[in-house]
Each structure stands twice: as C-alpha cells, then as structure tokens.
C-alpha cells in the first residue's frame, strides 16, 4: 500500500459492498483517465467511504479488474447487443467488476456477484440500466459457472 494512502479502520464494520462501490469509482477513473491503480488508490483514500470498506478486498478487486480489463471486454463483447465502446462508462465498469467476480472468484456465490452488480447499477447507472446489467451478468454466470448456475435455476 502506498505510504500516502491511509489505511482503513479495523476489519469490524468494513464492507465488501463499500469496497465494490469504491472499485466502481476506481475503474471509472481508470476508463476515463487512463490512471494507474496506485494513483487511483491514493485518490480514493480521501473518499468518505474508504474507512468503511474492506481494504484488502478493494485493492484485490480493483487490481484484478484493471489487469483483466481486456479479457473482460472480450468476454462481454460476445454477450452484448452493442459494442463494448457503446456502453456507458458506469455500466461498463459495473459489468467488468461483476464479471471479474463471476469468472475469477468462485468464493463469491454467483447470485451474490449478480445482485451486487445490479445494486450498483440501481445506485449509479441509468434508468433501467440495472435490468440490462442483470441480463448480461446472467449470461456470464451461465458461461463461467454452468454447474452452480444450473443448480441455482432449479
């Protein structure tokens, strides 16, 4: 962790949801301004929610999504009804975060990853954007975790 970034409060009370919200802000900054993750982490350390987030999860998710953005975009491209470049930057970031969790973090149940993406879209996305996000994430879950997805559909 860079020396300039402050560390959040002890683990009690820290939230993965707040971590995902911060990652959304970070990925958005990265997509819009081509900023490095270390710069993004330093900037987000001043966010009022930073102390309420699970720092380790935030850092891991931010770095994982940033490093995998090309892979995630390629995966999304085959499932969208438009070009990835035509997505709003917010919905693009949300889809990348949830897709990363679905593809790379099997410790998170697929329904949780989808629900968290939908909740971010409700908070930060456009009108009815959450419905679009839900549909795309459902397709990713079916591809990335077919057994878990089928069990969940029964």
From Swiss-Prot:
It comes from the Bacteria. Disulfide bonds: none annotated. Pfam families: NusB. InterPro entries: NusB-like_sf, NusB_fam, NusB_RsmB_TIM44. One of its GO terms (biological process) is DNA-templated transcription termination. One of its GO terms (molecular function) is RNA binding. GO terms for cellular component: cytosol. SUPFAM superfamilies: NusB-like (SSF48013). The keyword Acyltransferase does not apply. The keyword Thylakoid does not apply. Keywords: RNA-binding, Transcription, Transcription antitermination, Transcription regulation. Coiled coil: none annotated. NCBIfam families: nusB. Belongs to the NusB family. Involved in transcription antitermination. Required for transcription of ribosomal RNA (rRNA) genes. Binds specifically to the boxA antiterminator sequence of the ribosomal RNA (rrn) operons. This is Transcription antitermination protein NusB. The lineage of its organism: Bacteria, Pseudomonadati, Pseudomonadota, Betaproteobacteria, Nitrosomonadales.
């Amino acid at each position: 962790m860079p020396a300039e970034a402050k560390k959040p409060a002890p683990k009690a009370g820290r939230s993965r949801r707040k971590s995902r919200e911060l990652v959304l802000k970070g990925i958005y900054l990265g997509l819009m301004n081509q900023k490095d993750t270390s710069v993004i982490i330093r900037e987000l350390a001043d966010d009022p929610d930073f102390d309420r987030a699970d720092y380790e999860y935030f850092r891991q998710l931010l770095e994982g999504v940033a490093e995998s953005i090309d892979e995630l975009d390629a995966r999304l491209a085959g499932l969208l009804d438009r070009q990835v470049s035509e997505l709003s930057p917010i919905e693009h970031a949300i889809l990348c975060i949830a897709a990363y969790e679905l593809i790379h973090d099997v410790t998170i149940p697929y329904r949780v990853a989808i629900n968290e993406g939908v909740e971010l879209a409700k908070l930060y996305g456009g009108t009815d954007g959450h419905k679009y996000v839900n549909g795309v994430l459902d397709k990713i879950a079916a591809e990335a975790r077919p057994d878990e997805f089928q069990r969940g559909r029964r």
